[in-house]
Structure formats: structure tokens, C-alpha cells
């Protein structure tokens, strides 16, 4: 783990958090990440998304993690979605792993992933699932950290420029307490 990165969970939404989260999201989309948004992504749309996610976190439906560099600048985020059907209380979903392009390949994604896994165990969730663009940076990150591939779905989503892309579904079984 990168010692110059601090991971914290979003406890209370501050105006600066919304702006910083929006900047990371926009940077990722402008860099070509297929993360549910199309180009161009406005600040207003990005901020509205983060307000919805913060409200969901306040209801206990998800935990939003923030990664800050040594200067206190937000450089990444990920979500642990706990709101699952009642017959799946052992499961959670990992969503929106976003790392600003200037902070990639510095251990930020790995630190966020580690925080998500610890929080999942604390919430008694032993099965994590996610999907990511086949072959992208996230795909390699999850593969390196023990996640198992279930399969690929061709033409699942769109790149921000409108082209189709495939997704790969991953899971990770965590040790039960």
C-alpha cells in the first residue's frame, strides 16, 4: 500500500468533497473510462450524481471511500454497495473505482480495494462482486488482487465516446469471521 495515500470513508458530505469527487469522475470519463457517463460530462451532472450517492450513503446503503494524497488532494474513490436483496445479506458490490489519471500506478487503487475489503468484512459481507471493462486498468488491478473472473459480456456498455465495450464480471470470496 502507498503510505502517502490516506483512505477515509465519507462521513458527511462537504462542498469541497462534492467538487473534488466531481473532478475525479470527470477526469476519468474524459480519460475514456466507461463508468456510466458519456462525454461531455458537466460539473452539474457530476455533482448531482455525488449528491445522490452521498444521500444513499447517509441511508446506510453504501460506503464511499476517498483516497487523498500527502497534500490532502482527493485522487480516488470507490464505493461498497451494501443495499442488496434480503436473500443475499452476505454479499456486497464494489462500484465506481475511480482514480485520477495523475495518481494512477501509485498504489491508490490497491489501497482503495484493501479498504473496501476490510469494510466488507466488518459488515459481515463475505462475497464481493463487481464488473469492469474487459482489459482496462481495473481489470488488471482486480486480477492482481485475487479476484476471480466469472466471464465476459460483449457489448455491455458504451465508452464515453459512444462505442460499445465489453465488461468482465469478477467476484472475491472473503474469509468468514
Residue spans for each PLM region:
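Terminal substrate-recognition subdomain of acyl/acetyltransferases
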Residues: 2-3, 10-13, 148, 159-177
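Acetyl-CoA-dependent GNAT
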Residues: 12-96, 100-102, 113-115, 119, ...
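Active-site-proximal loop/turn and secondary-structure-junction residues that shape catalytic pockets
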Residues: 98, 134-136
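Residues forming the Rossmann-fold NAD(P)(H) cofactor-binding site
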Residues: 106, 110
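Conserved short alpha-helix immediately C-terminal to the canonical SAM/SAH-binding motif I
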Residues: 112, 136-138
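Conserved GNAT acetyl-CoA-binding A-motif
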Residues: 113, 120-132
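Conserved catalytic-core motifs of GNAT/GCN5-like acyltransferases
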Residues: 127-132, 143, 148-164
Amino acid at each position: 500500500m502507498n503510505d502517502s495515500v490516506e483512505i477515509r470513508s465519507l462521513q458527511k458530505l462537504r462542498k469541497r468533497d462534492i467538487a473534488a469527487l466531481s473532478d475525479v469522475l470527470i477526469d476519468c470519463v474524459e480519460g475514456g473510462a466507461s463508468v456510466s457517463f458519456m462525454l461531455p460530462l458537466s460539473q452539474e451532472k457530476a455533482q448531482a450524481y455525488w449528491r445522490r450517492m452521498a444521500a444513499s450513503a447517509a441511508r446506510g446503503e453504501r460506503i464511499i471511500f476517498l483516497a487523498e494524497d500527502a497534500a490532502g488532494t482527493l485522487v480516488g474513490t470507490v464505493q461498497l454497495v451494501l443495499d442488496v436483496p434480503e436473500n443475499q445479506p452476505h454479499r456486497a458490490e464494489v462500484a465506481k473505482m475511480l482514480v485520477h489519471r495523475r495518481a494512477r500506478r501509485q498504489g491508490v487503487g490497491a489501497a482503495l480495494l484493501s479498504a473496501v475489503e476490510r469494510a466488507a468484512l466488518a459488515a459481515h459481507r463475505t462475497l464481493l462482486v463487481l464488473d469492469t471493462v474487459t482489459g482496462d486498468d481495473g481489470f488488471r488491478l482486480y486480477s492482481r488482487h485475487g479476484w476471480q473472473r466469472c466471464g465476459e459480456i460483449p457489448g455491455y456498455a458504451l465508452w464515453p465516446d459512444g462505442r460499445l465495450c465489453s465488461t468482465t464480471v469478477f467476484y472475491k470470496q472473503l474469509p468468514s469471521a
